[in-house]
Regions:
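Amphipathic, charge-rich alpha-helical segments that serve as recognition/docking helices
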Residues: 51, 55, 111-119
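A sequence-level detector for short glycine-anchored, His/Arg-bearing signature motifs
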Residues: 83-99
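Short hydrophobic/aromatic-enriched beta-strand-loop microsegments
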Residues: 103-109
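Residue-level "edge-of-site" marker
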Residues: 79, 109-110
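N-terminal leader/domain-start detector
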Residues: 1-28
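Glycine-centered loop/turn positions within well-structured domains
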Residues: 73, 93, 102
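Short alpha-helix boundary/capping and kink motifs at helix termini
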Residues: 32-85
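Short loop/turn hinge sites at secondary-structure boundaries
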Residues: 69, 100-101
């Protein structure tokens, strides 16, 4: 199973970083929507954002999080293996796609930033 970011870190540490904020094109991140990023029945990496977007009734918890996502709060992105990936904000990413946005606000995380908070 492909994982976008294999390192382990805490969200609180990520949120505490002082990062540049930019407007970020969703087209750079849509590859993530097919990955099983979310849990189902307590088992991690079972449900993709696209599955929820196609069948919200089948995934009510994730559908609710997408519907309630606050797009004024930036997502966290990092460049890995030649492409951009999301560290925090997958439900916000799905919400932006659902709402037909073309860009979102994002905090840019560098490899050095991630190394600083990796356990």
């Amino acid at each position: 199973m492909e994982r976008a970011v294999p390192e382990r870190w805490r969200l609180e540490d990520l949120w505490a970083l002082d990062l540049p904020r930019v407007r970020f094109a969703l087209a750079e991140l849509t590859w993530l929507l097919d990955l099983p990023l979310w849990q189902r029945d307590g088992v991690r990496f079972q449900v993709s954002p696209n599955e929820v977007l196609r069948n919200p009734a089948g995934h009510p918890q994730h559908a609710r999080r997408i519907a309630e996502a606050d797009l004024t709060r930036p997502i966290h992105v990092i460049r890995r293996d030649g492409r951009w990936t999301v560290l925090d904000g997958h439900h916000r990413l799905a919400a932006a796609v659902r709402r037909q946005h073309t860009a979102v606000d994002a905090w840019l995380v560098s490899a050095a930033d991630l190394a600083e908070i990796t356990r």
